[in-house]
Curated annotation (Swiss-Prot):
Gene Ontology BP terms: nuclear protein quality control by the ubiquitin-proteasome system; proteasome localization; protein transport
Organism: Neurospora crassa (strain ATCC 24698 / 74-OR23-1A / CBS 708.71 / DSM 1257 / FGSC 987)
Its job: Involved in ubiquitin-mediated protein degradation. Regulatory factor in the ubiquitin/proteasome pathway that controls the turnover of proteasome substrates. Targets proteasomes to the nucleus and facilitates the degradation of nuclear proteins.
Family, similarity comment: Belongs to the cut8/STS1 family.
One GO cellular component term: nucleus
Chief location of this protein within or outside the cell: cytoplasm
Biased composition (Polar residues): 46-63
Region (Disordered): 1-69
Assembly, per entry: Binds the proteasome.
Transmembrane regions listed in the UniProt entry: none
Protein name: Tethering factor for nuclear proteasome sts1
Pfam families from the UniProt entry: Cut8
GO terms assigned for molecular function: proteasome binding
Amino acid sequence: MNVLLSPQPPFFPHQHEPSRRSPPRIMSQHTMASRKRKADDDDNEMSISPTGSPAINSRQLSRPSKKVRAGIELAGRPLPLPRLLETLDKSQLRAVLQTICERHPGIGHEVMVSAPRPSVNGALEVLGEYQDKLRAAIPFGNSSSEYTYFRVKQPLMALVDALGDFTPQFLPPVEQQATVSLEYLNHATKIVHDLPDFDSQQYRHHKDGAYDEISRAWALVITEAAKRGGGFHLHNGKWDQVLAKHNQQSGGKLEQAMNAMVNEVGWVGANSNAHGQGSSSDPNSILNQLINGTYGAPVQVGPF
C-alpha cells in the first residue's frame, strides 16, 4: 500500500495565489528580420499575381456579352423611308413626288409654296434636256418633211410646251428684275431659232407659234423696263441690238417686240418722233434699221 501512494502530497494552489505565467520568449533580431522579409515577399507576390489576391479570387471578371435581340426573329422587311429615298435618282424621285401631289392637291400646293423659285440657269438646264432629246430624234440623211416631222413630233411638242411653261415665270409681275427677264428671253429665243424647219407649212406651226409667244414676251418686258429710268437697263445692256439680231435671224417674226422697243423707249424712237413720223416706211428710220440689223453701223460721211 505504501508503494502505491505518492511520497509527496498533491499540491493545490491557493485560489488567491496568482497563476504562473509562461516565461517570455526572447526572439533574436535575426529571426524577426527574416520573418519580416518573408511577409514582405508574400505581399509582393500577392500584388504581382492577380490570382494570389483573395479579392480577385472572390470577384470574377465578366466579359461583355453580345447584344442579342431576344424574341425577335430575323425576317425580310421593307427599307425605312430615308433609306428608300437614298436609292432613287432625280427622275424617279420627281415621278414619285408628282404622283403624290396629283393625288393630294393640298400637298402639291404646299410644295409650290415651299419650293424655291427656279433660276435662269436651272430653267435653261431643263430646256436643254428637252432640246437634246429633240436632236437625238432627228433622222440622219435627207429625209422627207413628213417622215422627219413624225419622228420628232413628240420631243418637239414637249420642248415647245416646256418653253410655254417656263417663259411666264420670268415675266413681270412675277419677275421684277428686267435684267433677269431679258437674260432668259435671250437664251429662250436661241432655242426657238434651233427648232427644226420643215418645208411644209403645216409642220411649221410649232416654230411659228413659239416665235409669236417669245415676241410678245419681249414686248412685255421692254414695256415694263421702259417705265423704270427711261429704259436704262435696255440701253446699258445693248438689248436693242440683241433683239435686232434675233429678229433678223427669225426672218422678221419678232416684229411686235421691235415695235415695243421703238415706241416705249424714247432714245430709240427719238429720231422718228422728232420728224413727226411714226410709220416705218422710211428705210433710214430707227425701226427699219433695227429690223434690218443695220442699227449702230458706221455711217459714211462725205463724197467717199
